[in-house]
Regions:
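Conserved post-Walker A coupling segment in P-loop NTPases
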Residues: 6, 19-85, 96-112, 140, ...
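Nucleotide-binding/hydrolysis machinery
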Residues: 4-6, 10-15, 25-26, 52-57, ...
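Conserved catalytic core of Hanks-type protein kinase domains
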Residues: 97, 122, 145, 167
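A short beta-strand-to-loop transition that corresponds to the Sensor-1 phosphate-sensing loop
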Residues: 107, 145-150
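Conserved catalytic/switch belt of AAA+ P-loop NTPases
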Residues: 81, 114-138, 148-156
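Loop/turn-to-beta-strand initiation segments
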Residues: 99-102, 118, 139-144, 161
């Protein structure tokens, strides 16, 4: 069954998940997509965005595992001119770029604890602080996070903030592994 231009499936568990995803897409709540690597978490996040009231707004994805902590902070929240060596102009981070749309925080489990605290503040207050910036900037963003890890286990071992976990895991979605959907 051709569900969207990117998703084609006949798997009953996938069809059921996509039905749930379509139904929760209109919600403003944060979502957590958990699954093994390579199962299509970003495709599902994009599908949710395309079926939401924000569909005509930006969809911005960032892989939290791909950047070191200092660079990830600047990429997420932006930086002011002169904030650090090489910051020759203001930079709009991913949250500003996604304003009124959706941001996908891919592999959220790889985010360092200090940055998790800053992300939690953004989720609580709907505003960002640019690196080296003076004033907070309001943002209206739907957040979808993904992980291939057991985040609750990471919470238990002190590697992921419990408050952030519950703030992100408002609507949990789990993609079945590829080995369970051979069709």
């Amino acid at each position: 069954v051709n569900i969207s231009k990117e998703i084609i499936t006949q798997n009953n568990s996938m069809l059921s998940l996509l039905d749930v995803a379509r139904n929760v897409a209109k919600s403003k709540s944060t979502m957590m997509i958990q699954s093994e690597s390579g199962t299509g978490k970003e495709l599902l996040a994009n599908y949710i965005h395309e079926n939401s009231d924000r569909a005509k707004r930006p969809f911005v994805a960032i892989n939290c595992a791909a950047l070191p902590e200092t660079l990830l902070e600047s990429e997420l929240f932006g930086h002011a001119k002169g904030a650090f060596t090489g910051a020759v102009q203001d930079y709009r981070g991913k949250f500003e770029q996604a304003h009124t749309g959706t941001i996908l925080l891919d592999e959220i489990s790889e985010m360092a604890l200090p940055l998790q605290a800053k992300l939690l503040r953004v989720l609580q207050e709907s505003q960002i602080d640019k690196v080296g910036g003076k004033d907070p900037i309001p943002v209206d963003v739907r957040v979808i996070a993904t992980t291939n890890q057991n985040l609750m286990g990471m919470v238990d071992s002190g590697k992921f903030r419990e408050d952030l976990f519950f703030r992100l895991n408002v609507i949990p979605l789990s993609l079945p592994p590829l080995r369970d959907r051979m069709e």
